[in-house]
């Protein structure tokens, strides 16, 4: 009993709080206080989220303003390059400014163009008043940059025609990118009137770009036939002035114009009556070779068409212009099939071409196996795509090639086969059709066989050793010609320093400056104008 009493007292002592205010855990807060704290936290989180959103918007706006400032400075630098080209009569500085045009055009907006037009057109109020209504006036704030590229005496001097054309071209490109084609047409028409009255060699390169975008505007408006006479007039002027860049651009625009309306005869006459300038850049050469390849393919000159399109791929930029290379490959595959050759499987596996060339891969399989049913199936499935690519007319011609391939496969498989079985395998209407097709294949040299008209069968002849014919010689000749063409084109594309560089008439400082400029120019030319393809 004593032990039980002492145990109860010890338990009671443990339950009592320690005397003297010792450490003790505080009781948990009541539930309503917890709920109120959560609501306060939620309210505070909402206000924090709004503040974060405002901060992010302000940061994005600040970043955009910085990008606009950089774009304005780039435009200012390009204008300096144009002025330097005019004063020093060096067209390479114009090329340097135009080479950055695709990069600059992607960063254009109303704020940049409004500031540029107001900043540069200080003396020419007529052009400024004409361009500003097409642009939205930005809301000026304290953070906005005061863009004043022309101050003092320069503000009162008129702009150079090259600079004025370049700035107006930027507005045209922005309107095009914004899909405001009607407004772009008005600005471009005004720009063409100004360029047509000028006769300055430094303006030729800028004018060539203006011609290109002028035709693009009319193409988007589906009015290419309206601009054709203007392009012809400018081509005559460019030819008389020996403007190589203008000639190349205008010739390509006219060929594109004719091919858009399927005027192949007029396009062929233009090619035969004109000479494409050798000094044109690689991109214009690539376009010209592609257009001539299309003309040759329609006119049944398949060997010449394959040669020109192969050269077009060689002239095209290596890492960009994917759309252009896809278009050329589509036409080249069809032309090779029409020549009786099977394209290399490797080109169908390239990542940039694999998806777009899938219908042509199925078409190639049908032609290779001589399967007429599969050929008709591919034609029904992808007919609209072939029409959009402009290859449908040529693909229709492939039906005879499919039949020829089927006849050749049958001839290799059977030493003797009836005409009725051939008609059944090729899905022809009657044995008479099979007889006609086999006779034509024998005449064209597709197969070595004879037809027994009385008994209605085809007797294949023994295979001739191909090495006893001229086939190997022709194949080697084709390969050697290809290598020689590459060598000749590489030599023509090389750039040699002028003889004046051999004269030791410059100081060491001038030599260093010149070498630095040459190094920069070489780096820019190495890019080969990759961004010029739209």
Swiss-Prot record:
Residue spans of biased composition, Basic and acidic residues class: 1-16, 501-525
Modified-residue entries (Phosphoserine), positions: 418, 430
Subunit note: Component of the 19S proteasome regulatory particle complex. The 26S proteasome consists of a 20S core particle (CP) and two 19S regulatory subunits (RP). The regulatory particle is made of a lid composed of 9 subunits including PSMD3, a base containing 6 ATPases and few additional components. Interacts with UBQLN1 (via ubiquitin-like domain). Interacts with ERCC6.
Protein name (database record): 26S proteasome non-ATPase regulatory subunit 3
Source species of the chain: Homo sapiens
Region feature Disordered, mapped onto this chain: 1-69, 500-534
Signal peptide positions on this chain: none
Cross-link (Glycyl lysine isopeptide (Lys-Gly) (interchain with G-Cter in SUMO2)): 38
Alphabetized Gene3D superfamilies for the sequence: 1.25.40.570, Tetratricopeptide repeat domain (1.25.40.10)
Protein family according to the UniProt entry: Belongs to the proteasome subunit S3 family.
Residue span(s) of domain PCI: 286-465
Placement of covalent cross-link Glycyl lysine isopeptide (Lys-Gly) (interchain with G-Cter in SUMO1): 38
């Amino acid at each position: 009993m004593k032990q039980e009493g002492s145990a109860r007292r010890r338990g009671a002592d443990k339950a009592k709080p320690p005397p003297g205010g010792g450490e003790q855990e505080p009781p948990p807060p009541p539930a309503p206080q917890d709920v109120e704290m959560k609501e306060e936290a939620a309210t505070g989180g909402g206000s924090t989220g709004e503040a974060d959103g405002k901060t992010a918007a302000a940061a994005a706006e600040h970043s955009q303003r910085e990008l606009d400032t950089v774009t304005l400075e780039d435009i200012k630098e390009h204008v300096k390059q144009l002025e330097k080209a005019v004063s020093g009569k060096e067209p390479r500085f114009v090329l340097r400014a135009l080479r950055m045009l695709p990069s600059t055009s992607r960063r254009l907006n109303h704020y940049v163009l409004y500031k540029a037009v107001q900043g540069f057109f200080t003396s020419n109020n007529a052009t400024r008043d004409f361009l500003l209504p097409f642009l939205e006036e930005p809301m000026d704030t304290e953070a906005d940059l005061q863009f004043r590229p022309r101050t003092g005496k320069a503000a009162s001097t008129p702009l150079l025609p090259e600079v004025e054309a370049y700035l107006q071209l930027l507005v045209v490109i922005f309107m095009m990118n914004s899909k405001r084609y009607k407004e772009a047409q008005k600005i471009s028409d005004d720009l063409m009137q100004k360029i047509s009255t000028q006769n300055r060699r430094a303006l030729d390169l800028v004018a060539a770009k203006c011609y290109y975008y002028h035709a693009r505007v009319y193409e988007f408006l589906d009015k290419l036939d309206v601009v054709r006479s203007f392009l012809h007039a400018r081509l005559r002027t460019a030819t008389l002035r020996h403007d190589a860049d203008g000639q190349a651009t205008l010739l390509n625009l006219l060929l594109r114009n004719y091919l858009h309306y399927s005027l192949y005869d007029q396009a062929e006459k233009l090619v035969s009556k004109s000479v494409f300038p050798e000094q044109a850049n690689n991109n214009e050469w690539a376009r010209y070779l592609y257009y001539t390849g299309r003309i040759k393919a329609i006119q049944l000159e398949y060997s010449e068409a394959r040669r020109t399109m192969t050269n077009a791929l060689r002239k095209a930029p290596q890492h960009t212009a994917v759309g252009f290379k896809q278009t050329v490959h589509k036409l080249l595959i069809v032309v090779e099939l029409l020549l009786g050759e099977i394209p290399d499987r490797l080109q169908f596996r390239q990542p940039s071409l694999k998806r777009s060339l899938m219908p042509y891969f199925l078409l190639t399989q049908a032609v290779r196996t001589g399967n007429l049913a599969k050929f008709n199936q591919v034609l029904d499935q992808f007919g609209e795509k072939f029409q959009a690519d402009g290859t449908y007319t040529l693909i229709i011609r492939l039906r005879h090639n499919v039949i020829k391939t089927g006849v050749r496969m049958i001839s290799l498989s059977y030493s003797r086969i009836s005409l009725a079985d051939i008609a059944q395998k090729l899905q022809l209407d009657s044995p008479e059709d099979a007889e006609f097709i086999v006779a034509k294949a024998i005449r064209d040299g597709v197969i070595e066989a004879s037809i027994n008209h009385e008994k209605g069968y085809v007797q294949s002849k023994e295979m001739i050793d191909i090495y006893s014919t001229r086939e190997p010689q022709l194949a080697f000749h084709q390969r050697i010609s290809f290598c020689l063409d590459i060598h000749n084109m590489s030599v023509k594309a090389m750039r040699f320093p002028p003889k004046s560089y051999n004269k030791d008439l410059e100081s060491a400082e001038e030599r260093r400056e010149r070498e630095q400029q040459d190094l920069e120019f070489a780096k820019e030319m190495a890019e080969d104008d990759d961004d010029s393809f739209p």
